[in-house]
From Swiss-Prot:
<feature type="coiled-coil region">
    <location>
        <begin position="119"/>
        <end position="152"/>
    </location>
</feature>
<keyword id="KW-0698">rRNA processing</keyword>
<dbReference type="InterPro" id="IPR009292">
    <property type="entry name" value="RRP36"/>
</dbReference>
<comment type="function">
    <text>Component of the 90S pre-ribosome involved in the maturation of rRNAs. Required for early cleavages of the pre-RNAs in the 40S ribosomal subunit maturation pathway.</text>
</comment>
<keyword id="KW-0690">Ribosome biogenesis</keyword>
<comment type="subunit">
    <text>Associates with 90S and pre-40S pre-ribosomal particles.</text>
</comment>
<feature type="coiled-coil region">
    <location>
        <begin position="216"/>
        <end position="276"/>
    </location>
</feature>
<keyword id="KW-0539">Nucleus</keyword>
<dbReference type="GO" id="GO:0005730">
    <property type="term" value="C:nucleolus"/>
</dbReference>
<feature type="region of interest" description="Disordered">
    <location>
        <begin position="296"/>
        <end position="351"/>
    </location>
</feature>
<protein>
    <recommendedName>
        <fullName>rRNA biogenesis protein rrp36</fullName>
    </recommendedName>
</protein>
<feature type="compositionally biased region" description="Basic and acidic residues">
    <location>
        <begin position="296"/>
        <end position="311"/>
    </location>
</feature>
<keyword id="KW-0175">Coiled coil</keyword>
<dbReference type="Pfam" id="PF06102">
    <property type="entry name" value="RRP36"/>
</dbReference>
<feature type="region of interest" description="Disordered">
    <location>
        <begin position="248"/>
        <end position="279"/>
    </location>
</feature>
<feature type="compositionally biased region" description="Basic residues">
    <location>
        <begin position="146"/>
        <end position="157"/>
    </location>
</feature>
<feature type="compositionally biased region" description="Basic and acidic residues">
    <location>
        <begin position="319"/>
        <end position="334"/>
    </location>
</feature>
Length: 351
């Protein structure tokens, strides 16, 4: 049995302090410690066919070999006994002990093959990944800030507006420039005649179409003749409305013409005074002064009877306007506090 103990001692790998075993080796070591504790240093030489009992024998043999190293070296034995003991020890070795030794050797070789280059390479890869992650986060934060940032206002309203050049090019392209479509040109709304504002303030616009006033006057005479001849009341009312509208148009056109004449004369007079050196700055008419001069010109163009009728109409118009603006009161001597008559009298205007 001394040879078997010696073989087990040589096959068994002595664990190092910094060696890391696998789970299987750890479980084997735990079972070995438990068996040593139960045996309390006793030596068992029984043989079993099961793997669990073989593991127990191996642990017992290991402990026995460690305890009797000095005894084996001191006792001389014969060659015949050595051969028998060697065969017996080979038969006593279990598969669990062999697997345990193989696992410990594999772990040791794997640890030896591990070089610092792998550690440096893995650390370099980790650093690169960390930097890429940080750069990606910074880019996302910058994009979010740029979206939330408000548009910068211009330094002044006359400064050019800033527009982004990152715009998608449209797929629609104009290969050949087509000639513009012909448009109808109405001289009544032409800028050369009506002025750039389009409100008929051009000085030559009225002169170019002065003949239209003659047409309107002739149309007005025709409508009056039709109203005089017709006997249908509905048709007569309709013609009367048309005549009234045309008269209003002619009257407004004449008033505009008078205003333009008054303005032209005033400007001409002011320019003459400035040219003579009597005035340094021109005087611009107020609207009230302009209307007053227009009325004077209007009444000056009328005859005596027509002027009297016009003045009478204007007097009645102004009187009715003033009467509407006057306050009202109830008739009766004893009125209520709110001004109402006790017997429901009519209201009258204050004189």
């Amino acid at each position: 049995m001394a040879i078997s103990d010696l073989l087990n001692r040589r096959v068994r790998a002595r664990p190092e302090d910094d060696e890391v075993y696998s789970e299987a080796s750890g479980s084997d070591e735990g079972s070995q410690d438990g068996s040593d504790a139960e045996s309390n240093g006793s030596i068992h030489s029984q043989e079993d066919d099961s793997d669990a009992e073989g593991d127990g024998d191996d642990t017992d043999a290991d402990s026995q070999s460690e305890a009797s190293n000095s005894d084996i070296e001191e006792e001389p034995e014969s060659e015949h006994d050595d051969g028998d003991d060697f065969k017996a020890s080979l038969a006593d070795i279990s598969f669990g002990a062999l697997a345990k030794a193989q696992a410990s050797m594999r772990e040791k070789n794997r640890k030896d093959k591990r070089t610092p280059k792998d550690d440096t390479a893995s650390s370099t890869v980790d650093d690169i990944r960390t930097k890429l992650r940080e750069a990606r986060e910074q880019k996302l934060e910058a994009a979010a800030k740029s979206k939330s940032k408000e548009k910068k206002s211009r330094s002044s309203k006359h400064a050019p507006m800033e527009l982004s050049s990152k715009r998608a090019v449209t797929r629609k392209r104009t290969a050949v420039e087509l000639p513009p479509a012909p448009r109808s040109r109405d001289p009544r709304f032409d800028a050369a005649v009506m002025g750039h504002s389009g409100v008929g303030k051009h000085p030559h616009g009225g002169k170019a179409y002065a003949f239209l006033d003659e047409y309107r006057a002739s149309e007005l005479n025709d409508l009056k003749e039709q109203m005089r001849k017709t006997k249908n009341l509905q048709q007569k009312e309709k013609l009367k409305g048309e005549i009234r509208r045309m008269q209003d148009k002619l009257r407004s056109a004449q008033n505009k013409k008078r205003e333009a004449e008054v303005q032209a004369e005033h400007k001409k007079r002011e320019k003459q005074l400035i040219r003579e050196g009597k005035k340094a700055n021109p005087y611009y008419l107020k609207n009230s002064e302009l209307q007053k001069q227009v009325l004077e010109r209007k009444y000056g163009e009328m005859g005596s009877r027509e002027r009297a009728k016009a003045l009478e109409r204007r007097r009645r118009k102004m009187a009715s306007k003033e009467r509407k603006e006057m306050p009202w009161e109830r008739r009766g001597a004893g009125g209520d506090e709110d001004g109402g008559a006790p017997n429901g009298g009519k209201r009258r205007r204050l004189e």
